[in-house]
A protein has these predicted regions:
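Conserved catalytic-core segment of clan PA serine endopeptidases
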Residues: 34-46, 51, 61-63, 81, ...
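Protease-domain processing segments flanking chymotrypsin-fold serine proteases, especially trypsin-like
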Residues: 2-72, 82-84, 88-94, 265-285
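Extracytoplasmic
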Residues: 52-54, 68-70, 74, 95, ...
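Short glycine/acidic-enriched loop and turn motifs that connect beta-strands
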Residues: 80-83, 228-230
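Active-site region of chymotrypsin-like
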Residues: 43-55, 138-146, 171-264
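Short, solvent-exposed loop/turn segments that connect beta-strands within catalytic domains
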Residues: 63-70, 107-109, 185-191
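Active-site substrate-binding loop(s) of clan PA
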Residues: 58-64, 116-122, 132-172
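Beta-strand/loop subdomains of soluble extracytoplasmic proteins
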Residues: 108-116, 158-161, 170-185
């Protein structure tokens, strides 16, 4: 896991996949065909990202979220202030007063957002946390002129150009989605269908929880979480890949993220997390 940078205990456990703040991506030239013109890629900025005390994150919304809904902040399960959730552990609706520094497009902190609760958190099958804030999307936009990042609803595609935007470091990393991992194992934890980056995304500690943004759409397709630091096999800070046949592969220096499309159906009316909703792919307690 990407080190959350909060002390010796967590530093020893969290791996340093550092996601640099998303550098503005160059606009892709529209490719014309006989029938259609593809849209130009959007420049990725820090707008909507947040800095936690130990990690990175972002203010996110589902396509159905309303302006008056309490806003959500997305980060990693291993970034929770309560510590690492154990294998099989799922947190739902836990009170929280955690604060987040909201960043504008250039990476400047413009205000402080406050959580009312940990709406969801786990390190089982995926590595994510969702905080519900005391502010609505409308209040955040009115106060700071910043909109939430939208979550993609479809499975990402290999070869997609992406940017990892770290609010903690105010740095970005740009690369492509290299492929997907059946099971990614690290220490006691196993994550499913993880995103593997091409080598250009050399994320470091503190980038944990950074949004992984599709350069073409500006939507969040994953949340950055780990990387193999020293070539060890399946140990803390050295995840290994396990395919459908049980074959283990170690890729030293390669970093990974967890997909987020499967959590979108879990976000119900009023931005409440409902694990029983149709299509919800998050583990239950």
């Amino acid at each position: 896991m990407n080190k959350p940078l909060i002390g010796a205990f967590f530093a020893a456990l969290l791996l340093g996949a550092g996601i640099t703040p998303a550098v503005a991506a160059e606009s892709a030239q529209a490719q014309e065909s006989a029938t259609e013109t593809a849209p130009a890629a959007k420049a990725v900025t820090f707008s909507g990202t947040v800095a936690l005390s130990n990690c990175s994150g972002s203010v996110v919304r589902s396509p159905d979220s309303q302006p008056t809904d309490p806003a959500l902040v997305l980060s990693n399960g291993h970034c929770l202030e309560t510590g690492f959730p154990g294998p099989g552990e799922v947190l739902v609706d836990r009170p929280s007063t955690r604060t987040f520094t909201l960043l504008n497009a250039s990476g400047t902190g413009v205000g402080t957002l406050k959580a009312s609760k940990i709406a969801y958190g786990t390190m089982t099958d995926t590595d994510l946390s969702l905080y519900e804030l005391t502010s609505t999307y409308e209040q955040i936009e009115t106060s700071y002129g910043i909109k939430a990042l939208e979550l993609e609803t479809a499975h990402p595609v290999a070869g997609t150009a992406i940017t990892v935007a770290s609010g903690y470091w105010k740095r970005t990393y740009s690369c492509d989605i290299d492929g997907f991992v059946h099971q990614l194992r690290e220490g006691r934890w196993t994550w499913k269908d993880s995103v593997r980056y091409t080598p250009e995304c050399q994320t470091i500690g503190g980038t944990s929880g950074s949004p992984v943004i599709d350069d073409a759409t500006g939507k969040v397709v994953a949340v950055n979480n780990t990387g193999n630091e020293s070539g060890q096999e399946c140990t803390d800070n050295n995840p290994c890949e396990v395919d459908e046949n049980g074959e283990v592969t170690v890729r030293e220096g390669i970093n990974y993220a967890q997909q987020t499309y499967n959590m979108v159906p879990c976000i119900g009316i009023g931005n409440k997390i409902d694990l029983d909703r149709e299509g919800c792919g998050l583990p239950k307690p």
